[in-house]
């Protein structure tokens, strides 16, 4: 459903959704089964100093944030994150080189975003995370033969998450224990990279 968290570090409020397997119905009326897909027009009323992240690009009119999902999508892959999230952006640029029909290489560009609580901004190693994400985009486009389908790609580190991460289309949520606030072992970095690449692979599968 929709999870609300008050950060004990600064009393700021954060929201995010987790709908897998069948909890979208806790937030909006739907037939909550993965074989029944729909398009969506989403509108969220939120404080204007909040960041709202969803599957598609978000536009604001006053205190209402809106987005649309104009392709058929299962309800469990719809996502919303809202709050005073710290934001870092980048862009992946590459090409599709392994088309099954042998077509010429296709130039591609995907906007990337990484988000975390404001109180964790000092610990967010965004450059490393972007590097690993871009390496994943390079590898998958080199081997899968189909371009990334969801426009932009955001990764949001969220608190009190009850799994490792969730492959919401274009709006992946990840447990914020992966924002390391003290020296981490090589194993922890490997586990985080594995999670990042696992969720990115879900954008194709």
Regions found by a protein language model. Give the residues of each.
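Compositionally biased, intrinsically disordered low-complexity segments enriched
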Residues: 5-6, 20, 101, 204
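Hydrophobic helix-coil surface modules that form long, contiguous segments used
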Residues: 17-24, 29-197
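N-terminal, polar/Ser/Thr-rich
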Residues: 10-13, 34
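Active-site His/Glu-centered metal-binding helix of metallohydrolases
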Residues: 196, 200-205
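A surface-exposed beta-strand-loop module
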Residues: 1-9, 66
């Amino acid at each position: 459903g929709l999870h609300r968290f008050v950060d004990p570090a600064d009393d700021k409020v954060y929201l995010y959704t987790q709908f897998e397997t069948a909890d979208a119905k806790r937030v909006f009326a739907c037939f909550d089964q993965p074989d029944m897909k729909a398009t969506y027009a989403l509108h969220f009323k939120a404080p204007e100093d909040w960041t709202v992240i969803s599957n598609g690009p978000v536009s604001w009119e006053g205190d209402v944030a809106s987005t649309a999902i104009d392709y058929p999508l299962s309800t469990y892959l719809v996502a919303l994150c809202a709050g005073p999230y710290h934001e870092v952006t980048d862009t992946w640029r590459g090409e599709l080189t392994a088309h099954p029909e042998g077509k010429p290489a296709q130039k591609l560009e995907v906007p990337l975003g990484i988000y975390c609580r404001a109180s964790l901004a000092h610990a967010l190693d965004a450059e490393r995370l972007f590097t690993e994400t871009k390496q994943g985009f390079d590898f998958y486009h080199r081997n899968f033969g189909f371009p990334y389908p969801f426009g932009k790609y955001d990764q949001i580190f969220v608190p009190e998450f009850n799994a490792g991460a969730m492959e919401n289309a274009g709006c992946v949520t990840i447990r914020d224990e992966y924002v390391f606030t003290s020296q981490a072992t090589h194993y922890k970095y490997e586990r985080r990279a594995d999670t990042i690449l696992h969720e990115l692979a879900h954008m194709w599968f």
